[in-house]
């Protein structure tokens, strides 16, 4: 479950083959570089380099000889230098629907945690291994394990702060008195989808039907022993299809079609979502960060759009950002505005990356599916916000300025330089300031009025309906199963 979740601003990434521009030179837009699938690369059989395997692999922990599908698939990984160079380059002759899951499994080691481990230790394990979710075992070899992720950490934080309540009075008392709480008890507080297990002899068509319904990941198991061989996440499947899109000619028509034509994404925030659309959930930039975290908790979502009073998209806050407020010294951020939090994160990311960064987590109704998938893959995001382009001459709110921890802001005249550089495992430490990653914006980086959202689930559901026998796949079924918290 190494699925990298969307960050606060979904910073863009530059392709590895793109040369860095000089400070005074306009940088090429990421979508100009990534709107078409990577060129086909013929890989010789027998090569040992993990970067040329069908799905890259990474040793996550010693002592566990289980296997995983990819660097990002066993436990939802955050940004890493290794993943920036992990390209899925294996060429397949058959249609993608018929590829057996066994062909994608690569030997690796999974990271599991015991249900008796404290929430604090579980969080430290996430950070130590640069992950965003971990399987929680009640006993070694537990086949019905659930996962601990940042949604659980968010629920725990809200419980500690007294912003939510649960029926278990003992857990409430332990949380609010600072006592260690077993992670196995916390994960039970957040509704989960079933732990789906798919035999490795099944093909991608089967998995597409499951992931296209909104399930975030499935376990790939040995067909004889039923032991887990790996975990396939929505994003890793999307990356696999994108990186090999030139080999799958039946994807061409869909990739060249616009979101509007395909009918995916909510294109009107006032229109109720259908069975094939996701809801647009946003928060005003003037609201406290704590309200945003609570809203993500109640709505069972992993990210939320930040807008101004005119409905203009300003930024994005992800549930993974809760790691930025786990220390007592960071608690003041909880009561400051969402706009302030976004600016602080931009500064922090700029310092960690060593380069300027700017969010490109939006697309337009007229954007092609290819451009949308390219941005999802490049930003490691789960969803992109659909905006209506700003008409010339229309005044809109200025973009969020990177802000220091004390609230001061600074702007730079430099041009934007999207970067795929990773966020280090220690990114949950104190937030610091850096030079502003915002500067003169060209049309590609301007946003607009929030009118919709398109997610990995929407796209995988579309592929399932168009190219598999799963014609009735409902992208919202898994979310309805998880439910929302009564307010």
UniProtKB/Swiss-Prot annotation:
PANTHER family: AMP-ACTIVATED PROTEIN KINASE, GAMMA REGULATORY SUBUNIT (PTHR13780), CBS DOMAIN-CONTAINING PROTEIN (PTHR13780:SF36). InterPro entries: AMPK_gamma/SDS23_families, CBS_dom, CBS_dom_sf, Ssd23. SUPFAM superfamilies: CBS-domain pair (SSF54631). One of its GO terms (biological process) is regulation of mitotic metaphase/anaphase transition. It comes from Eremothecium gossypii (strain ATCC 10895 / CBS 109.51 / FGSC 9923 / NRRL Y-1056) (Yeast). GO terms for cellular component: cytoplasm; nucleus. Residues 105-165, 189-248, 274-333, 396-469 form the CBS domain. Its main location: cytoplasm. This is Protein SDS23.
């Amino acid at each position: 479950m190494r699925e990298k979740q969307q960050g606060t601003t979904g910073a863009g990434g530059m392709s590895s083959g793109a040369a860095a521009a000089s400070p005074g030179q306009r940088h090429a837009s990421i979508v100009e570089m990534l709107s078409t699938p990577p060129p086909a690369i013929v890989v010789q059989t027998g090569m040992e380099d993990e970067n040329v395997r069908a799905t890259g692999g990474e040793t996550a922990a010693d002592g566990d000889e289980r296997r995983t599908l990819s660097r990002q698939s066993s436990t939802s990984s955050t940004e890493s230098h290794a993943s920036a160079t992990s390209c899925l380059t294996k060429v397949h002759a058959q249609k993608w629907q018929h590829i057996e899951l066994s062909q994608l499994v690569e030997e690796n080691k999974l990271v599991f945690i015991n249900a008796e481990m404290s929430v604090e230790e579980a969080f430290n394990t996430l950070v130590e291994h640069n992950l965003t979710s971990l399987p929680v075992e009640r006993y070694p070899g537990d086949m019905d394990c659930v996962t601990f992720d940042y949604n659980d950490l968010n629920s725990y934080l809200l419980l500690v702060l007294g912003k939510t309540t649960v029926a278990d009075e003992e857990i409430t008392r332990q949380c609010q008195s600072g006592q260690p709480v077993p992670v196995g008890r916390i994960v039970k507080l957040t509704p989960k989808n079933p732990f789906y297990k798919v035999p490795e002899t099944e093909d991608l068509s089967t998995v597409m039907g499951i992931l296209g319904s909104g399930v975030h990941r499935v376990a790939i198991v040995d067909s004889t022993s039923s032991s887990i061989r790996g975990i396939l996440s929505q994003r890793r499947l999307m990356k696999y299809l994108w990186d090999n899109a030139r080999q799958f000619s039946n994807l061409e028509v869909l990739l060249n079609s616009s979101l509007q034509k395909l009918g995916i994404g909510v294109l009107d925030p006032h229109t109720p979502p259908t069975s094939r659309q996701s809801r647009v959930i946003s928060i005003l930039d003037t609201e406290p960060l704590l309200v945003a975290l609570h809203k993500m908790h109640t709505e069972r979502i992993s990210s939320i759009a930040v807008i101004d009073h005119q409905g203009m998209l300003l930024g994005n806050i992800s549930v993974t950002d809760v790691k930025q407020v786990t220390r007592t010294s960071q608690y003041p951020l909880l009561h400051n505005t969402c706009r302030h939090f976004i600016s602080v994160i931009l500064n922090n990311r700029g310092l960690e990356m060593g380069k300027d960064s700017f969010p490109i987590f939006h697309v337009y109704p007229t954007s092609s599916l290819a451009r949308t998938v390219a941005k999802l893959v490049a930003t490691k995001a789960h969803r992109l916000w659909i905006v209506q382009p700003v008409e010339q001459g229309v005044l809109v709110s200025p973009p969020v300025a990177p802000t220091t921890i004390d609230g001061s802001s600074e702007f730079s005249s430099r041009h934007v330089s999207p970067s795929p550089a990773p966020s280090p495992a220690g990114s949950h430490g104190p937030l610091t300031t850096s030079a502003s990653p915002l500067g003169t914006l060209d049309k590609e980086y301007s946003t607009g009025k929030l009118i919709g959202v398109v997610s990995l689930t929407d796209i995988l559901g579309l592929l399932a309906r168009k190219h598999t026998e799963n014609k009735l796949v409902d992208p919202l079924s898994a979310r309805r199963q998880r439910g929302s918290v009564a307010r």
